[in-house]
Amino acid sequence: MVAADRLARARAAAASVPDPEIPALTIDELGMLHDVALIGDTVEVAITPSYLGCPATVPIAQDVATALARAGFPNARVRTVLAPAWSSDRITAEGRRKLAASGIAPPDRALPQPRCPRCGSGETEQISAFGATPCKALHRCLTCREPFEAFKCH
């Protein structure tokens, strides 16, 4: 198999891994897949956690290694890179769409408060800086009165 084909297959396998904390999105859509390289005959994948100390980093690395093994790369290496640091700006347009479809307001630096993912209102308030995961906060829509999580801008 040609190196470019192997690299494309490895990238597709790594990119398909869902985030364990937000399984509707892949690590690629969240912008955590930093690099996929072919070094000699070995595939090396670099992932960037969404924040320092993210508890999902180890399970994500294990899931990437498993996905690569299933794709025919049993000796692949997965490493964590911290620089450049992850930013919520790395979330793809598709990732933002999937967050909203899952009831999680995507991050938007241009807005003072996140828009309600249910009704679209910008009239929201933060209830708690802490959501189900450290990368999210709990909000409430003042229009439809529904609570929702919002992905924090980093």
Predicted regions and their residues:
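Domain-level signature for proteins that mediate thiol-based redox and metal-cofactor handling
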Residues: 1-154
